[in-house]
């Protein structure tokens, strides 16, 4: 069982220890974490850049994955609701590039992809990856009735 996280840019070395700590906590739930790091396009035209990067994302989505894109226009979910998304053996989370993604192209090419939001704040990719990992761990803790999550 695997969770893939597609994002742009590599992870800074000083953050790898934090990611590894979260990944090790998730492993107890029998899931592997795979980072798929893509390179941002240097295209100056923002709409073209988003389209090219979206095409790159679509090519990298693992087959037979339940897939979710993080976007500020996505559905805001509670930790409990997020835990219900973790009911598949292969899950893919997408973090778009610095200008986002071509959401129309995503919806047209893969209408099965869910759009999620963790609120209206904007985060650096390195921080958001850590937030996603923590929420995956929290979600599994809720799903398997572990004592990590204390809110209703």
Curated annotation (Swiss-Prot):
Catalysed conversion reaction: pseudouridine(1915) in 23S rRNA + S-adenosyl-L-methionine = N(3)-methylpseudouridine(1915) in 23S rRNA + S-adenosyl-L-homocysteine + H(+)
Compartment(s): Cytoplasm
Keywords (A to Z) from UniProt: Cytoplasm, Methyltransferase, rRNA processing, S-adenosyl-L-methionine, Transferase
Predominant location category: cytoplasm
Molecular function via GO: rRNA (pseudouridine-N3-)-methyltransferase activity
Residues that bind S-adenosyl-L-methionine: 69, 96, 118-123
EC numbers on record: 2.1.1.177
Cellular compartments per GO CC: cytoplasm
Cited Pfam families: SPOUT_MTase
Role this protein plays: Specifically methylates the pseudouridine at position 1915 (m3Psi1915) in 23S rRNA.
Quaternary assembly: Homodimer.
Family assignment from sequence similarity: Belongs to the RNA methyltransferase RlmH family.
Name of the molecule in the record: Ribosomal RNA large subunit methyltransferase H
Native source species: Mesomycoplasma hyopneumoniae (strain J / ATCC 25934 / NCTC 10110) (Mycoplasma hyopneumoniae)
């Amino acid at each position: 069982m695997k969770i893939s996280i597609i994002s742009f840019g590599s992870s800074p070395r000083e953050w790898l220890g934090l990611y590894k700590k979260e990944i090790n906590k998730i492993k107890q739930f029998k899931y592997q974490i795979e980072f798929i790091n893509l390179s941002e396009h240097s295209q100056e035209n923002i709409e073209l850049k988003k389209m090219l990067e979206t095409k790159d994302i679509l090519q990298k989505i693992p087959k037979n994955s339940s897939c979710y894109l993080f976007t500020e226009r996505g559905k805001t979910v509670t930790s409990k609701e997020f835990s219900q998304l973790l009911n598949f053996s292969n899950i893919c989370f997408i973090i778009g590039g610095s200008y986002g993604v071509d959401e129309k192209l995503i919806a047209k090419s893969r209408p099965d992809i869910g759009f999620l939001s963790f609120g209206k704040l904007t985060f650096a990719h390195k921080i958001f990856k850590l937030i996603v990992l923590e929420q995956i761990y929290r979600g599994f803790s809720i799903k398997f009735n572990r004592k990590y999550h204390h809110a209703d």
